[in-house]
Design a protein with these regions (language model features):
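Ligand-binding clefts of soluble mixed alpha/beta catalytic domains
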Residues: 1-550
């Protein structure tokens, strides 16, 4: 046992003895060395062998992913870990991405497969809450085997703490979640609480993996068919897919460029040399070619994304949920440097009819824009909601109500341009003046009515009845059925043309004030862009009253 000394170490006579043992300078150097070790320990992760395994799977380490997001030195927060590596599987930090502060968390799969314990859950929760308190966006890089089994209930508590934190910042700051590797259980729930989820190819996430499904249900299914990007992109569980991890990270950075820091601010305005006042000849050519098609004419399927391309700066837009419900396009773009959320009917798919999936897709996008002060432009070409027993069983009435509610609740600047069809209840709900639209414009090709061409039999009842009676009389008099049908169909075509000429146009809507003005082809960008600038000059960004979630 070491003897205790009662000598004063600061006595000049004892100075030599102190220096021989451990001088204050030596102790300080030791502290610096230990501090450097602690600082560098997270960077080493699970060691070189674990890193090689990660690379052999075609996956980056969490530190390599961070380097893709920023060229600046990351400010790492919450470096804590326990004696049993508790907490070491999570990296948290603040990154400078294009001059903006962004909170980031990422699983380090080289340490205990990025599994969740109580310490990890606390680290993630603190990082998430800090993003909300400081009003900065959050990016999550998920690559975890799930709860750490030896941690017992501590791993589950870790997820619970992170779940609660994610819910608290929902609607306060935007969040982007990236799915790397294989994530199950809580590792699937947590990222889906985010505003946007991006999943690259050759990854999986779901409630349970294929082995559990096989044991529980006897169903043999691959991980890709159970929880791969093709499955989740169609259902709307993921918002974007990418070919690989690098593509996913770049998509996250591009998406971030359209998003504000928080619900009190507006998205970044990007300076541009483009003017909003130019005539866009490509738009006029596109509409002319579409609506003068010699075969289908005004019934030509029209991919609205081609039209959207003529409106946005440099023809560049960023589509969200591109695979799900293709008859409805949701995208971010810029006009005059200002970020806009576009929601457009796309008759190139399912005739543009709004079904259950399209309603929920649109409602989610509109709610997000409303929360984060992003103006919305509706491009309308809709003949109605999808009919049929299948849609009724799927809950189209409830889903349609969700879409309608989201549109009515909009408090951000919102415009509508009727490109072609605007029929019935779909017209009523699609940001008309009477549900709160700031301005409603129409191209000369707009057809606004209670019903489409089928409405001829209700407007021209006598003429319609006479055509059918003439057909029956011809048959009774011995006219061949084919010849009688030709006469009938020719008369019906003329009656339809009359209906379209007299009623399927914007004139009545313009007279009633349901449309504020006609926009000529080639001038849509000018009218929409300048009107948007006017509205934004008088819009004060703010959070919505009360707790509002995404």
């Amino acid at each position: 046992m070491e003897e205790l000394s009662l000598e004063n170490p600061f006595d000049p006579e004892n100075a030599e003895a102190v220096s021989v043992k451990e001088s204050p300078e030596m102790l300080y150097d030791q502290m610096l060395t230990r501090g450097e070790e602690l600082l560098q320990k997270p960077l080493r992760g699970g060691g070189e062998s674990r890193v090689r395994v990660q690379h052999s799977k075609g996956r980056m380490t969490v530190w390599e992913r961070i380097k893709v997001l920023t060229s600046s030195e990351p400010h790492i927060t919450f470096q804590n870990w326990g004696s049993e590596l508790d907490g070491a599987g999570i990296v948290t930090g603040i990154l400078n991405i294009d001059g903006r502060d962004v909170a980031v968390y990422g699983h380090d799969f080289t340490v205990r497969a990025g599994s969740m314990d109580a310490t990890n859950g606390g680290k993630i929760a603190r990082q998430i809450l800090m993003a909300g308190e400081h009003g900065i966006p959050l990016i999550g890089m998920n690559d975890s085997a799930g709860a750490y089994v030896p941690a017992g209930v501590g791993g589950l508590d870790g997820y619970s703490e992170a779940f609660a934190a994610m819910r608290k910042i929902s609607g306060v700051v935007p969040s982007i979640m990236l799915m790397f590797g294989y994530n199950a259980g809580g590792g699937a729930y947590l990222p889906r609480q985010g505003a946007f989820v991006i999943q690259p190819e050759d990854t999986f996430f779901g409630l349970t993996g294929p082995n559990v499904v096989r044991e529980a249900l006897g169903e043999n299914i691959s991980a890709d068919d159970l929880g791969g990007p093709k499955v989740h992109s169609k259902s709307g569980v993921v918002d974007l897919i990418a070919p690989d991890e690098l593509g996913a990270l770049r998509s996250a950075m591009r998406l971030l460029s359209y998003l504000p820091d928080n619900n009190h601010s507006t998205p970044p305005v990007r300076s541009t040399s483009l003017t909003l006042d130019d005539y866009v000849e490509e738009e006029a050519i596109l509409l002319h070619k579409t609506f003068t098609n010699p075969v289908s004419g005004f019934n030509t399927p029209f991919d609205m994304r081609l039209f959207l391309q003529q409106l946005v700066d440099y023809g560049d837009y960023f589509e969200i949920q591109q695979v799900r419900a293709k008859q409805l396009t949701t995208a971010f773009g810029r006009m005059g440097g200002n970020v806009v959320g576009f929601i457009a009917n796309n008759s190139a798919y399912a005739s543009g009819n709004i079904d259950t999936e399209a309603s929920r897709k649109g409602a989610k996008f509109i709610r997000f824009c409303n929360l984060y002060n992003i103006p919305v432009i509706f491009l309308e070409d809709v003949s109605g909601y999808a009919p049929g027993s299948e849609q009724e069983r799927a809950g189209v009435v409830q889903a349609g109500r969700e879409l309608l509610d989201a549109i009515v609740d909009l408090r951000v600047p919102r415009l509508t341009l009727i490109v072609r069809n605007a029929f019935g209840g779909a017209y009523c709900a699609w940001n008309s003046y009477h549900v709160g639209g700031d301005f409603v414009f129409a191209l000369p090709s707009a057809r606004i009515a209670v019903m489409g061409p089928a409405g001829r039999q209700f407007v021209y009842k006598d003429e319609f009845r006479e055509i059918l009676q003439k057909y029956q009389q011809d048959l009774d008099s011995g006219t061949a059925e084919h010849d009688a049908a030709v006469v009938r169909d020719t008369a019906m075509v003329k009656l339809t043309a009359r209906y379209e000429r007299e009623l399927l146009n914007p004139e009545e809507a313009l007279r009633l004030g349901s449309v504020s003005r006609i926009v000529m082809p080639g001038h849509s960008r000018k009218v929409l862009g300048n009107t948007l600038c006017y509205l934004l000059r008088h819009y004060q960004p703010s959070a919505m009253g009360g707790p509002q979630r995404e």
